[in-house]
């Protein structure tokens, strides 16, 4: 007999008591007020960041605006000329640095100057912010300047570390290392760490500092998945055309003092959140609940994710993980409620997805076993929340658990793909990682979704790429959308996964009107799909000929196009063992020599097709073709003479007929 459902008012009261519900913004403000009741008014004023440092007068503003425009144009004849210009800006900016970095207009100039200045100038700018780093980190525009400054400073710390004899006579006065300047700045920020964690702008600065101190990659500030800036900031940075220099997207060596500072920062934050508790048993449930609220706060959550990622460098107990989650083998009602919130909230699911990737395996296995194992399909159906957690589990759990998830999810795959195409990629990767586990079932589900056998109008280009609703063929010069790019990448993954999808895609292309297929070749995204099917050894010769019949007609125009030229480069190999098609394309390009050579893309195609050799030494070009064919098809046999048996039979028949003739003449 199954378990009876518990009913009654007391049970409902207990459920409400255990339920996790984050505080509203007003409640958070109340919590912050409670935390500050022990400070007097003077101390409260000291903790408020100073963010106004005056404004530039009209003439100064006009000069710096013009300087910013000049740097953006970057029309200098020599690097020395550019450096002299940057030096003149720095001289003019002395004493006005704080006004410049807190202005929307001139903060962009300061970022450009920091990216272009030398080490001595960088240190001067760094020192000009002493005493106000906290205020600047909380400022909408100055915080971006600080991030650029800190990345360049990290690069300089490494250079000084690897070159102890770094020139210290560059300027008069005592020589100060970048390491010491950085440590001085960190001491200035330490009293404000908890405030920075939950601040709209300062939280990004804090995340960057943790990355630097832990020797993690300092990401590009304009990439979509960058941890350095917010989504709005990355878009704005692209629009104002500030390009990162070579110091970004790298890992830097750091001195031992940085590891000590990282430990000190994380320990300080932990004590701040636990009210200085000596052991875990001294931490109250209300304290744990408050910290869990921080974990699902859209500003503080990324910082906590990063702390959980790096705390293992020096803390074997993983204190922050244990502050968020329990470690006991039994279920906990409050933790269960918290997990349910994480699995159904966009911020919470992103938090759980990321910490799963950096936590100890035994901790992840515990969460999976207690709270997710029995409802994995239901979680996968939560396309904006739970599905991301399931993907993380597929990537990080042991083989046995991954196979259990695949057993549950694969039969539902065609339905799950309706709302989350990326989930298909996760399933394919997990199946491959487990030695092709359930591979045939995965393929069957994918075909059922994108190329159903019973459908008369089946076309994977339509079902997967949604061609009819896309920007293909638009005359308004619409940019390809992010959704089109995502779908194209997924189809390319399917093509690589199994030959069935390669052949299905080619069949779908051949089913299109020729004009439509040619349009795909000129599209910024869909051209990659056309390029991806041109795999010489995987496509049978009949389908190769059918594709070449269409593409060869457009060879000259394709060669002169930014996207089509890549397809033409692939056709050089795709025409192997199809000499007639190769010569037809080469002849068409040579007949339009002027047009091809006048195009930057056409010149590259001309070079890759070895057409200078074709024009000057045709036989050498044909010899090159034969060598290429042998490289691509090393096991293919050239035309062989008839076997000896047949030749003997032929000779015998000739001798027999001759004997008959002799007999006849007798």
UniProtKB/Swiss-Prot annotation:
Keywords, comma-separated and alphabetical: Nucleus, Repeat, Ribosome biogenesis, rRNA processing
Extent of Basic and acidic residues compositional bias: 642-653
Covalent S-S links between cysteines: none
Start and end residues of each stretch annotated as Disordered: 1-40, 635-666
Gene3D superfamilies, per database record: Leucine-rich Repeat Variant
Example of a GO MF term: RNA binding
Pfam families (UniProt xref): PUF_NOP9 (PF22493)
Summary of the function given for this chain in its UniProt record: RNA-binding nucleolar protein required for pre-rRNA processing. Component of the 90S pre-ribosome involved in production of 18S rRNA and assembly of small ribosomal subunit. Component of the pre-40S ribosome required for release from the nucleolus.
Subunit structure: Component of the 90S pre-ribosome. Component of the pre-40S ribosome.
Similarity remark: Belongs to the NOP9 family.
Protein name: Nucleolar protein 9
